[in-house]
């Protein structure tokens, strides 16, 4: 799990500091980096669907405001709440299997139990609603009030999503097996990528800093766990990092607009 960071001035490894005229790059771990991303996509979809059901308790199902398209409230709320619920569930289960069960691959159990549980909950809620309502309910009755305004909003958030995605992948991306990061932020990415890989390629439970063994974590790390878990599920690191970052920022802008 060695990472090689080459800047315009120095080459950093986990054991040495070498003068180098090279470019900024990080050699990518060639495990799940080359794998499929389907399980990672399923994870995000399950999180969004679970969050949609849970967030209705906060946003109020069936409520509507004249002229306001509440879909821009529902979408980010679903993503945010769902990611929190599913990711914490997977982390706690994985922690239990690692610390108590002494499992060598705790994320396997965490993801199987967490994702299966989320799917079961979603199915049970859907069946219960279908029976209570006596059929399928029109999904957009309370979420879309102004269709003319909706077209402009879709254009706005579509352009924002394209720009933010470009910005994220411009700074952090993988090309030919090499993980590149921006000139002014590569130093910050070193501990972040190490934390991600400590989950996707390691067993960092109880969680501690990869760079400072034995010290408990005093810095928020659940984003790194989420990204590492998505990479564990087969999603390439840059996709995992940038997709979550893009969705989070676009969701924040949707809430700000709403």
Residue ranges of model-derived segments:
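Membrane-embedded, hydrophobic transmembrane alpha-helices
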Residues: 2-4, 8-16, 22-147
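Alpha-helical transmembrane segments of multi-pass membrane proteins
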Residues: 64-67, 157, 238-239
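Alpha-helical transmembrane segments and their helix-start/interface "positive-inside/aromatic belt" motifs
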Residues: 74, 149-158
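Alpha-helical membrane-embedded segments
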Residues: 120, 159-160
